[in-house]
């Protein structure tokens, strides 16, 4: 039972590799009944076609019975067409060209319309209800997979900021200053900004998929926590933090794609939002755990705690996290058929496409295209700068909080960590606003047939004021009462979280064929800003501080910049269609 339910997990892969289990025998009766190769989709399509014709005839007979029934049928057809449009948009938001593994569905539909031309050696899903297709997994299995994704994402994001409560001890032990001590945070963030440039395209290769990248990099990530806990010099710690940042990046970059692999397209935005809540909440919860370790033991126990959390998560993933990429699942099916039958003619469409793609072209698209699109596309450049500054401002709070809560209110190390929980409360409000916007604006426009990509920007336009307000409010109320800076956190998350969701949805729809490159470039910009801001943050606050307002002018400086950048959604709402029409990468050009 376990083998059947989790046949594409690492543990089952190992059992299969050593010959202790055989997976895929059930497909022999489907693809080679009586030893003769057949195209199972052709048979399924023929049967499906007859059933659909019968249903159409019955529907037309019933529809002539009363005019009321005709109106109901017409209304249902309108809703179905709107849902089809909804699904199409969600596929575009998911990456169009396979970022969420939806290519095979279109091709399967096209092949089904011409069963006489079906290739008996072409391996595809056995119709839309194929039980091995992740969309058709049981609800409990889908939930378990998504929960594992969220836990894995949270732990990797925790790795960035869990270190911060122990920074003073590290500086004292290794006799270094604040900037060098902060490098351990910055290099980790820079690592997970660079990693997606390499790992995101690899996750789209059908012979690799997502699960092996998540697992093998996380295994190395877990092992290196031991090295971080035992290191004896600051240079070694900085290097280890950079490497672990790179290793944690696969799930941070493509975890959303795995959510899309598992969920039906129309539900993807909701679950992506929930996954993003974990990505925001994890870095702000980590300082609480780090502070507890520093108070109870010392800074090295921060990494021992990371080791224990990683180890428990790793066991779950090894045994229960299956491959989710649709194309990789088909590749595995074809590979098993080739092995079981001894016939090398079984293949998938993705395999043929990859064989025809030169390695040099793949590398060029991977490394150069994200930078090229930033340089040539004003829409991408504008939002990359905007989001990068927001992300940098987020990491500035790790420098500002000790100044405010420890310096002014004399909070303990653990209490300073607890002050970050305002961001978590803000996530609840932010996610609620996102769901309301999707239902009341986006979905409504779909049903009316009036959707256009710029509608996503309404969310950023409505909440854009919250970002500069939160920075001004945080800076100028810091000495009034400790609760006021925490309230500012709510407004910050409300704005930044929904800016991210609106921007990523907008960019994905504008550039569906190049969404992986768009997001890789955006991640690089975000990581670069987030790595740099903590390095100069304390110096900025110290230079601009006054006795009464220690963080006011520093926060105000960033706040004024965000005021200017908050105009970007308004400008692109008006001029976005014209810019897309002149783009060399947009399908609207």
Curated annotation (Swiss-Prot):
This is Multidrug transporter FLR2. The keyword Membrane applies. Residues 56-73 have a biased composition (Low complexity). GO terms for biological process: xenobiotic detoxification by transmembrane export across the plasma membrane. Its main location: membrane. GO terms for cellular component: plasma membrane. Induction: Expression is regulated by the transcription factors AP1 and PDR1. Disruption phenotype: Increases the intracellular accumulation of 5-flucytosine and clotrimazole. Gene3D superfamilies: MFS general substrate transporter like domains. InterPro entries: MFS, MFS_dom, MFS_trans_sf, Multidrug-R. It comes from Candida glabrata (strain ATCC 2001 / BCRC 20586 / JCM 3761 / NBRC 0622 / NRRL Y-65 / CBS 138) (Yeast). SUPFAM superfamilies: MFS general substrate transporter (SSF103473). The chain crosses the membrane at residues 143-163, 179-199, 211-231, 234-254, 275-295, 301-321, 378-398, 417-437, 455-475, 480-500, 516-536, 551-571.
């Amino acid at each position: 039972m376990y083998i059947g339910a989790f046949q594409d997990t690492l543990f089952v892969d190992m059992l299969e590799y050593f010959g202790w289990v055989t997976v895929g025998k059930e497909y022999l009766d489907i693809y080679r009944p009586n030893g003769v190769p057949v195209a199972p989709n052709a048979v399924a399509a023929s049967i499906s076609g007859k059933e659909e014709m019968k249903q159409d005839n019955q529907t037309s007979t019933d529809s002539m019975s009363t005019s009321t029934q005709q109106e109901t049928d017409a209304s249902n057809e309108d809703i179905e067409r709107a849902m089809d449009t909804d699904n199409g948009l969600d596929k575009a938001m998911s990456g169009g060209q396979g970022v969420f593994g939806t290519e095979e569905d279109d091709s399967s539909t096209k092949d089904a319309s011409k069963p006489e031309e079906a290739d008996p050696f072409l391996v595809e899903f056995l119709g839309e209800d194929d039980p091995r297709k992740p969309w058709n997994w049981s609800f409990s299995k889908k939930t378990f997979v998504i929960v594992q994704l969220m836990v894995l994402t949270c732990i990797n994001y925790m790795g960035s900021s869990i270190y911060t409560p122990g920074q003073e001890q590290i500086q004292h032990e290794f006799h270094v200053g604040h900037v060098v001590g902060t490098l351990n945070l910055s290099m980790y963030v820079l690592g997970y900004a660079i990693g997606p440039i390499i790992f995101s395209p690899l996750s789209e290769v059908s012979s690799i998929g997502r699960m092996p990248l998540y697992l093998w990099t996380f295994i190395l990530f877990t092992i290196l926590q031991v090295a971080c806990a035992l290191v004896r010099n600051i240079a070694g710690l900085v290097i280890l933090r950079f490497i672990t940042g790179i290793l944690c990046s696969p799930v941070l970059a493509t975890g959303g794609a795995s959510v899309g692999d598992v969920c039906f397209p129309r539900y993807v935005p909701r679950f992506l939002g929930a996954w993003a809540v974990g990505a925001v909440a994890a870095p702000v919860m980590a300082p609480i755990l780090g502070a507890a370790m520093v108070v109870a033991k010392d800074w090295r126990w921060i990494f021992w705690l990371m080791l224990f959390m990683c180890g428990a998560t790793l066991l779950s993933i090894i045994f229960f996290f299956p491959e989710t990429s649709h194309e990789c699942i088909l590749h595995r099916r074809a590979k098993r058929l080739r092995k079981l039958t001894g016939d090398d003619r079984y293949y998938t469409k993705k395999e043929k496409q990859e064989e025809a793609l030169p390695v040099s072209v793949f590398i060029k698209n991977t490394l150069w295209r994200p930078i090229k699109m930033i340089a040539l596309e004003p829409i991408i450049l504008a939002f990359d700068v905007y989001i990068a500054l927001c992300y940098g401002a987020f990491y500035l709070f790790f420098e500002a909080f000790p100044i405010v809560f420890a310096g002014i209110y004399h909070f303990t190390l653990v209490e300073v960590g607890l002050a970050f929980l305002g961001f978590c409360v803000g996530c609840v409000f932010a996610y609620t606003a996102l769901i309301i916007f999707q239902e009341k604006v986006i979905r409504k426009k779909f049903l009316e047939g009036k959707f256009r990509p710029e509608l996503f920007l309404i969310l950023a336009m409505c909440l854009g004021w919250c970002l500069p307000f939160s920075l001004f409010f945080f800076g100028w109320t810091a000495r009034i009462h400790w609760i006021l800076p925490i309230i500012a956190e709510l407004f910050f998350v409300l704005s930044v979280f929904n800016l991210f969701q609106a921007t990523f949805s907008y960019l994905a729809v504008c550039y569906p064929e190049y969404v992986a490159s768009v997001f890789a470039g955006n991640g690089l910009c975000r990581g670069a800003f987030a790595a740099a801001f903590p390095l100069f943050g304390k110096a900025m606050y110290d230079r601009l501080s006054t006795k009464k307002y220690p963080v006011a002018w520093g926060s105000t400086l960033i706040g004024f910049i965000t005021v200017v950048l908050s105009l970007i959604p308004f400008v692109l709402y008006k001029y976005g269609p014209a810019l897309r029409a002149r783009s060399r990468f947009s399908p609207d050009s």
